[in-house]
């Protein structure tokens, strides 16, 4: 075990640290995460539609059906405009990392994004790419725009006004050069894409990323994500915070597509969404530790019992850092196998049950800090998802049990030695 830990520490830690420190990757992750509250609000609109579908008939159904346009109205300005908000947040985050003041870089990123997505049909501007289909274009627009700003300011390629001019006016003129450069380049790219690629730039990006977009929503991809998430946690690094830099943009795009499909009465396609990760795969926290928490509460070892009692309330709401650091699970040889590999078995069960249609796929993106089963039901509007959550927790508890007993035995021996 020690040799394995040393090898992983040697090769895995440098990569994880670089991912944590890389500005662009972190800007994408933070920007996507900042967009999630908007998706949560928009996804609640689908709950009204789901309730109507569950009822089938009756006065409540008639009321919901008659007012569905009003009840789902907000969805058009939240889920259906996901790429707009993500573009702004990503650009804003990256500009802050470069110490660029004000909101001008983020607003310019929106200008670039709209130019790249501009498709005129019958004299009207299409909104086709403002949602999940334009998300990757938004990422490109945000990163590109801020880089242009950074280069311009670093090399002093901007209009510098006398110090007697008010700061607001100085900032306005300073932003002109990078704004003009970004606009010219965006117009050129958009027209080149339409002229030579015969498609809008967002579609060109989607075509190029098609293998990755399709491949991320598969069982092997999910298992890889979960494995590295748990492994990083085991070594004391915040697993989801690091791995989400890779998968967050895909997961939130899948969620938006599912919500849009369900609202339109079409089949829901995707399994791997932000909601799935936090509401089911990490229910009660990474490693599905609620069962372990209960075992620790009932432990004869005082140290484990006290940690279990302190951790139970946060654990019910998906926060298990007190348990991870208090036990500790980090670098604990007894916990390596159940904490890292147990969730992989649970992930396989979740994917297969949803893929086979035994449990409904995600149609909403509720917050993951609700008690076990609650967020899963809100995410799928399927009571079987609640059963699935408790089956997973029981299974993971069984998986933890023999390793917990070994850990408890060692802790009892330590406590008895101290008492002597």
Regions found by a protein language model. Give the residues of each.
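Alpha-helical membrane segments and immediately flanking helix-loop junctions
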Residues: 23, 83-97, 107-111, 264-334, ...
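Alpha-helical transmembrane segments in multi-pass membrane proteins
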Residues: 41, 83, 87, 91, ...
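Membrane-interface helix-loop-helix junctions at boundaries between adjacent transmembrane segments
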Residues: 102, 119-220
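Generic multipass alpha-helical transmembrane bundles of integral membrane proteins
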Residues: 180-299
